[in-house]
Amino acid sequence: LLSRRQRQMCIRDSKKHIIEKYNEKGYRDAVLVEDSVVNYNDKRVDIFLKVEEGDKYYLKDINFVGNTKYPTEQLLYILGMKPGDVYNQKKLNERLTTDEDAVSNLYYNNGYIFFGADPVEVDVENDSISLEVRIQEGPQATINRVIINGNDRLYEDIVRRELRTKPGMLFSRDDLMRSTREIAQMGHFDPENLVPQPIPDPDNGTVDIQYNLVSKANDQIEFSAGWGQTGVIGKLSLKFTNFSMKNLLNPSTYKGIIPQGEGQTLTLSGQTNGRYYQAYSISFMDPWFGGKRPNTLSVSAYFSKQTDISSNYLSNNSYG
């Protein structure tokens, strides 16, 4: 059951959403003029709302002012709203600022991080609204610093090679989001807490990019064991996802029992079916072989020994 305070908050949010829905349908003047809550029983209540809808409005005209980098025709095409459409304030905001292909992203992806768009109703006649979108383009911004916080698993250059945002480049929102996805796909950081933070500096026309990371362990251990007629039956597999081959012979750099920090994967596994069957394997994977491009190198080796119970025949197999 909801507490009295929770119920009041739920009712308040519901009333807000109702007005928003009216606005989406063109009723920009819709207001709640009366509401009441009546207990239906011990567990339920009835909510009565009185709404004044007002007139339904349509777009009479849309114009952009202040835009010098892109023509009005291009901005109108991206906006996707035209004279005669229902005046939908939510859609207007989404197409200007929040959608992935919004007008703002045309600017943000080309360095204009100081961009702003202010829709203004310049004329309201009967049920028709003339809209003027006032653009503040600002200068193009270059990236000054790229700051990485919270990384305690990888060498910093291992993280930086995944980034598409580098000092001296024009700011691009697409590059920022792609860099975020690339870091998340590495598997070493919590994607839910991975929120990049642009820090604009209008005085210098630059922007710092800050990535706040939360490390997470993703090594894997698999173990199973039992007993059968042939003896101990078991399997052990160890997967290290942050291995560092270059530090293999440098124990002073080890974190734990193995060298770590390059994001390489080392997998060791072995299994036995008593004295009649044994198998061992080792594999290594480097997602950035050579360190300059994301070229994957995979190497593996396998060894097995099997004895035929009936004939005591022994066979050894290995490959790499």
Predicted regions and their residues:
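A short, glycine/Asx- and small/polar-enriched loop/turn
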Residues: Y40-I47, V124-L131, P202-D208
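Interfacial loop/beta elements and low-complexity acidic/Ser/Thr-rich segments
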Residues: N23-D46, V51-N63, Y87, Y112-V122, ...
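Gram-negative/organellar outer-membrane beta-barrel architecture
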Residues: R153, M169-G320
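Extracytoplasmic/secreted envelope proteins and their assembly/folding machinery
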Residues: K15-I19, T72, L76-L79, N93-S104, ...
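Conserved "repeat-terminator" motif of extracellular CCP/Sushi domains
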Residues: I47-K56, E132-Q140, I209-K216
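Short, well-structured beta-strand/strand-turn elements
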Residues: N23-N39, N109-D123, M169-D174, R181, ...
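Single conserved hydrophobic/aromatic residue that forms the stacking wall/gate
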Residues: L1-I11
